[in-house]
C-alpha cells in the first residue's frame, strides 16, 4: 500500500514540477514584454495627449455643420473591443467582455461590434454576438499600420451612416496589478467653449483638412488603446503566472511532506516486520 502511495505522490511531484517550469518561464517572458510595452505606452501617450489638444482647438473653430461633430442621424452604436490573441492572462479578457455585454444588453438591435484579438472573437462567438469585423494576430508592439486599418473602417462606417456613435472598449493600464476597463466615446466629437482660442488662425480653412485630421486622431487614439491593452495584458499574465508558480511551490511543499511521511511510515513498518520475524524465530 505504501509503495503504491509513494509512486502516486512521486508522479504528482513530477507533474507539478513540470507545470511550475512552464509558469515560471511564462512569467519571465511576460515581465520582459511588459517592460517593453510600458516604454511603448509612455511614448504613444505623449503623442496622443498632444494630438488631443490640437484636435480640440480645431473642432472648436468649425462653425459649419459637420457630421463628425453634430452627428449623422444614425441610432446605431459601434463598439470596438480590444482583447488579446493569447490566453493565460487572468481575468483580462473576461472583464472586457462582461463590460461590453452589460453595455449592449438593453439595446442589442442597435449595437454593432468590431473585435480585436482571438480571445474576444472566441467569447463573442460563444455568446452568439455577431461582429462587423475581426482583427487578430496584432504584434506585441502595435504600429500605425494596424491603427490606420481600423481607423479607416470606423470612418467608413460612420460617414456612410451605418453607425451613429463609436465607442472604444479597452483596458487602461495603471500598474502590473491594476488595470481598468474603459468605454470611451470617440465619435461624434464634443465641442467646447472656444473663447480661449480666438487668437488662432487656420490657413487653409479647417474644413479643407478636417478629414485628414480626423483620421490621424483616430489612429493616435487607437494606437493609445493598443498600447494600454498590450501593457494590461502582459501585466495580467505576469501576475497570473507568478501566482500560479507560487501555488505550485506551495503544492510541492505539501507533496514533499506527504511523501516523506509516507516513506517514514513504510520504513517503520518494514523495521517492525523484521523485528517481529526475528522474535518469532527465537
UniProtKB/Swiss-Prot annotation:
Domain of life: Bacteria
MF terms in GO: ATP binding; proton-transporting ATP synthase activity, rotational mechanism
Record's bilayer topology term: Peripheral membrane protein
Compartments in which it is found: Cell membrane
Gene Ontology biological process terms in this record: proton motive force-driven plasma membrane ATP synthesis
Transmembrane segments: none
Keywords from the UniProt entry: ATP synthesis, Cell membrane, CF(1), Hydrogen ion transport, Ion transport, Membrane, Transport
Signal peptide: none
One Pfam family per UniProt: ATP-synt
NCBIfam families: ATPsyn_F1gamma (TIGR01146)
Family of this protein: Belongs to the ATPase gamma chain family.
Role: Produces ATP from ADP in the presence of a proton gradient across the membrane. The gamma chain is believed to be important in regulating ATPase activity and the flow of protons through the CF(0) complex.
Subunit details: F-type ATPases have 2 components, CF(1) - the catalytic core - and CF(0) - the membrane proton channel. CF(1) has five subunits: alpha(3), beta(3), gamma(1), delta(1), epsilon(1). CF(0) has three main subunits: a, b and c.
Protein name: ATP synthase gamma chain
Gene coding for it: atpG
Amino acid at each position: 500500500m505504501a509503495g503504491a502511495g509513494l509512486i502516486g505522490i512521486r508522479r504528482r511531484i513530477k507533474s507539478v514540477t513540470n507545470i511550475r517550469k512552464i509558469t515560471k518561464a511564462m512569467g519571465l517572458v511576460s515581465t520582459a514584454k511588459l517592460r517593453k510595452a510600458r516604454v511603448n505606452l509612455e511614448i504613444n501617450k505623449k503623442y496622443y495627449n498632444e494630438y488631443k489638444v490640437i484636435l480640440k482647438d480645431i473642432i472648436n473653430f468649425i462653425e459649419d455643420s459637420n457630421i463628425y461633430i453634430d452627428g449623422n442621424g444614425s441610432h446605431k452604436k459601434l463598439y470596438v473591443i480590444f482583447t488579446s490573441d493569447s490566453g493565460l492572462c487572468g481575468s483580462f479578457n473576461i472583464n472586457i467582455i462582461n463590460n461590453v455585454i452589460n453595455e449592449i444588453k438593453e439595446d442589442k438591435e442597435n449595437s454593432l461590434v468590431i473585435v480585436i484579438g482571438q480571445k474576444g472573437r472566441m467569447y463573442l462567438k460563444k455568446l452568439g454576438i455577431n461582429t462587423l469585423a475581426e482583427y487578430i494576430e496584432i504584434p506585441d508592439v502595435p504600429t500605425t499600420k494596424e491603427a490606420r486599418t481600423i481607423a479607416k473602417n470606423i470612418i467608413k462606417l460612420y460617414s456612410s451612416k451605418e453607425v451613429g456613435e463609436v465607442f472604444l472598449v479597452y483596458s487602461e493600464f495603471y500598474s502590473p496589478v491594476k488595470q481598468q476597463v474603459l468605454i470611451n466615446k470617440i465619435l461624434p466629437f464634443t465641442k467646447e467653449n472656444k473663447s480661449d482660442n480666438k487668437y488662432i488662425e487656420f490657413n487653409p480653412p479647417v474644413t479643407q483638412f478636417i478629414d485628414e485630421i480626423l483620421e490621424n486622431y483616430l489612429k493616435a487614439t487607437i494606437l493609445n488603446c493598443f498600447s494600454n491593452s498590450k501593457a494590461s495584458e502582459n501585466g495580467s499574465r505576469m501576475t497570473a503566472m507568478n501566482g500560479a508558480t507560487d501555488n505550485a511551490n506551495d503544492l510541492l511543499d505539501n507533496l514533499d511532506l506527504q511523501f516523506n511521511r509516507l516513506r517514514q511510515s513504510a520504513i517503520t513498518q518494514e523495521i517492525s516486520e523484521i523485528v517481529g520475524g526475528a522474535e518469532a524465530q527465537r
